[in-house]
Amino acid sequence: MFDTLVRFIRDQYRTDDFVPLHAPVFNGHERQYVAETIESTFVSSVGEFVDRFERDMVRYTGSARAVAMVNGTAALHIALQLAGVRRGDLVATQPLTFVATSNAIAYCGAEPVFVDVDRETLGLSPKALEAWLQESAFINNDGECQLLADDRIIR
């Protein structure tokens, strides 16, 4: 199993060399940007660079608005809240992910339910999700998905 996974990752990067978890890429202007940010005195959640990033994201995605977050975990947490995830809910996710995914679910007071991954894409398997839902869930009169065992909402 692991050999297949390692081969899949190496094929994506077209290399047999070491594949780092994170390899920073710098285009040469980082020192200038950091200096400009420090000189502006806006070094956290506001300032010219944050405003520019949000404008660029709106333009790129075509969305009405964009809000920069401190990190991916915070972004996932907000996204889950906006999706209606509440305390006691179950949230289907995949086990082959960064821990932030499960942490964000837990921050909402919900519980992650791990559904198998697709061997070809390494993303959540639609077939596995369908099988689990058909075996373990029902749609209530309000159109919500609930767990057969204890009626918890599945998001």
Please tell me what each predicted stretch does.
Residues 46-90, 104, 114-116, 136-152:
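Phosphate-binding glycine-rich loop
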Residues 117-132:
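ATP-dependent adenylate-forming carboxylate-activation enzymes
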Residues 1-43:
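N-terminal "arm"/small-domain region of PLP-dependent enzymes with the aminotransferase-like
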Residues 109:
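Structured binding elements
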Residues 2, 105, 134, 154-155:
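N-terminal Rossmann-like NAD(P)+-binding domain of SDR-like oxidoreductases, especially those catalyzing
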Residues 97-102:
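Conserved coil-to-alpha-helix start sites within the AMP-binding
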